[in-house]
Amino acid sequence: MTKSELIEKLATRQSQMSAKEVESAIKEMLEQMAQTLEGGDRIEIRGFGSFSLHFRAPRTGRNPKTGTSVDLDGKYVPHFKPGKELRERVDAINA
């Protein structure tokens, strides 16, 4: 599901909000989440999951075109850990 598909689906389910209001709310929520992670903080949505930053240590990589070794710097990457409720709902699909 893309962001525009999510907005469309929510707009049809929320008759009290216009599609533009739903779009604005989604964009603002995503922006706030990005700013929170950018500040190094963790986001926890109970039952859904948590977003945090994980550090990837410096390593030696390989340029896929040339095959030469390339030193890669350490960096922080966004990480999502599903919550118990979400994990159980997804697991129920496989049962």
Swiss-Prot record:
Classification via CDD domains: IHF_B
Keyword DNA-binding: yes
Entry GO terms, CC: chromosome; cytosol
Domain of life of the source: Bacteria
PROSITE patterns to which the protein is assigned, alphabetical: HISTONE_LIKE (PS00045)
One matching Pfam family: Bac_DNA_binding
GO molecular function, one term: DNA binding
Stretch list, region Disordered: 56-76
Entry keyword annotation includes Transcription regulation: yes
Coiled-coil regions listed in the entry: none
The protein's assembly and partners: Heterodimer of an alpha and a beta chain.
Similarity field: Belongs to the bacterial histone-like protein family.
Classification via PANTHER family: DNA-BINDING PROTEIN HU, INTEGRATION HOST FACTOR SUBUNIT BETA
Function description: This protein is one of the two subunits of integration host factor, a specific DNA-binding protein that functions in genetic recombination as well as in transcriptional and translational control.
Protein name per Swiss-Prot or TrEMBL: Integration host factor subunit beta
Species classification: Bacteria, Pseudomonadati, Pseudomonadota, Gammaproteobacteria, Alteromonadales
